[in-house]
Amino acid sequence: MSLLLSFYLLGLLVSSGQALLQVTISLSKVELSVGESKFFTCTAIGEPESIDWYNPQGEKIISTQRVVVQKEGVRSRLTIYNANIEDAGIYRCQATDAKGQTQEATVVLEIYQKLTFREVVSPQEFKQGEDAEVVCRVSSSPAPAVSWLYHNEEVTTISDNRFAMLANNNLQILNINKSDEGIYRCEGRVEARGEIDFRDIIVIVNVPPAISMPQKSFNATAERGEEMTFSCRASGSPEPAISWFRNGKLIEENEKYILKGSNTELTVRNIINSDGGPYVCRATNKAGEDEKQAFLQVFVQPHIIQLKNETTYENGQVTLVCDAEGEPIPEITWKRAVDGFTFTEGDKSLDGRIEVKGQHGSSSLHIKDVKLSDSGRYDCEAASRIGGHQKSMYLDIEYAPKFISNQTIYYSWEGNPINISCDVKSNPPASIHWRRDKLVLPAKNTTNLKTYSTGRKMILEIAPTSDNDFGRYNCTATNHIGTRFQEYILALADVPSSPYGVKIIELSQTTAKVSFNKPDSHGGVPIHHYQVDVKEVASEIWKIVRSHGVQTMVVLNNLEPNTTYEIRVAAVNGKGQGDYSKIEIFQTLPVREPSPPSIHGQPSSGKSFKLSITKQDDGGAPILEYIVKYRSKDKEDQWLEKKVQGNKDHIILEHLQWTMGYEVQITAANRLGYSEPTVYEFSMPPKPNIIKDTLFNGLGLGAVIGLGVAALLLILVVTDVSCFFIRQCGLLMCITRRMCGKKSGSSGKSKELEEGKAAYLKDGSKEPIVEMRTEDERVTNHEDGSPVNEPNETTPLTEPEKLPLKEEDGKEALNPETIEIKVSNDIIQSKEDDSKA
């Protein structure tokens, strides 16, 4: 249609004889996105002299590299490359003829910008604790709507008010921390075009280094080949790099320094004095750096250079010296090992005997009026704040002999050997001698006197044969410190005095318990038992009952009921039996009916119940029988009666009913009558729920034993057959060889061994002679009845005993004021603290 219109207009012009201009542009309106290229063709009808293009600002367009105008006859083409927003507007195409007349046409160019992301960097890194701004520059025309998403949730909906969108569409995170790391999505939308685009941005939070140094101060000793390791751990993100500095210089690994674990450990080797000082650990990463300092203090450890053992004498004085060196100068402490008591410089004991003085690493411990308790080990400890050193010395105290035992009086009698012990301690050890009347014992004419040395003891064994052997003996001990002696007395022993306070404390038809008091004097020799004599009043024969040890209580058994008895008590020591006590009379109880029996029960096997009878008071006559009556409690059954012999200790009730309660009455009978009945009630358990009998439940004991023997024989046969085929031995192999006429050398040897053994048993076997001793023949301790060693030819029959003894647990006690000591027909009153038996 437009073409026809053009030809029509052309015809009009030709016919009129005038050339009219007419301008057209191929496009009247164009939309173009930024960055796209477009061209427009302008056509002039007529005889144009020129065709020009004008930009929206009215300026004539001159060709450039981006905007190009090309003219081809009556056409002119405008090309715009890589259009931008500024290119938008109305472009005019103007044609001019020779007469200067112009015609023009216009085209409207609209330029829009697609969603464009500029300067979007991923990842974006921030420092922990700062206010972060995540940059996302997005543009379009019209302006886009921008939103941020984190974990598929818009940040504007997150309750954390640290997140906010800025006016420039960037995301702000206040006080960002490590937990905020992740992927954030920047999304742009153009509603008019339905256009959407996004960019995922990785946000990384860098944490500045934080150094952890578990120990900052170190002590080391110089010139000892020691080494010290510093530890420096650093946390942060990214992982910090650790380096060490000393005096401002970087430490590198060499013979002096060792670096381990990514420089987390620094070891200083062969420490010397100059190695002391600060060591700086520095940790660095993108977020910053941190440093901490470790300090190495190098000291000379204390060392004791002089300490030696000392020897002094009792009541003397001595000075103990301890010298030590070190840097810093150490303090010296003394410690007495025996009691753990410590002394430091300036200390003084309460009694003023011990005093410590010292200065500049030297200490002196001075002791005056030396006591034996001061002897022993002394520890010297030199200590400073970097360590310590300890050594020990020994203080030896020499002293004159000391007699340990306080017992100086011993008792014996003619024909009874006794050992007198002279126990001496001394330093140095003393020489010990026995004397009597200035005569050193044993003398040639004193065959009944012998001496034995056992360590620090010198034992004098005396076997008295006459009154002359009783009297004073002297023990003398000597060393280079001094001489000491002690006098001992061998006194003539006597039999004990009579016990008193005899009484009956318990009484029955056939027994009586007798109690009495110990005698006032045991005669100088310990009492080893008491003798209680008992007889019926009408009888002349006394029965003797011996006490157990020195117990002052004796039980008399097998007495006749309702009978009057007489008793008397005498004490017996090594010398012999003492005087009897005053005779006491008592009467046993008459025979009566037994007391009610005491019963306790428990279920027995099956439908039976076991009633156990506790030993009871039989009234003085043996129990002849028990009469048992029982019946069920749940119904009015008649009583069933059962009699059991009196020597039985239990009763079995059989054929009872499951879960049934029973009532039992038990009466005991002796020859005088019946006791009151004892009532006992019990209930039977429910019937057992037996699911299945096993094989062995159905077999008797003999069958089970038979099966066991058969199994054992089967195992032996299998073992013998295995030995036959594997090792060519066993019973089967023996039978085979005998049947085949073979005989091994080992069999001959075995036979010879058997024959030799038989000959030995026949000719040389003799049973050893074993000496048997009954319980009554055993030697017992007279004090508590325990076994003791039997006396030999050098052991006296009596043991020395300290006086006085405590009156407790049945042991003998002797009042020293009542003892007379017989010495060579003289009477010597013993002292309370020296009288020892």
From Swiss-Prot:
UniProt note on tissues of expression: Expressed most strongly in adult and fetal brain.
Cellular component terms (Gene Ontology): axon; membrane; neuron projection; nuclear body; plasma membrane; synaptic membrane
Domain Fibronectin type-III: 498-591, 593-688
Signal peptide residues on this chain, from the entry's feature table: 1-19
Bias-annotated ranges (Low complexity): 789-798
A GO term for molecular function: identical protein binding
Stretch list, region Disordered: 764-818
Residue positions with a glycan: 177, 219, 309, 406, 419, 445, 474, 562
Modified residues (Phosphoserine): 765, 786
Disulfide bond annotation, renumbered to this chain: 42-93, 136-186, 232-281, 322-380, 422-475
Protein name: Neural cell adhesion molecule 2
Gene designation: NCAM2
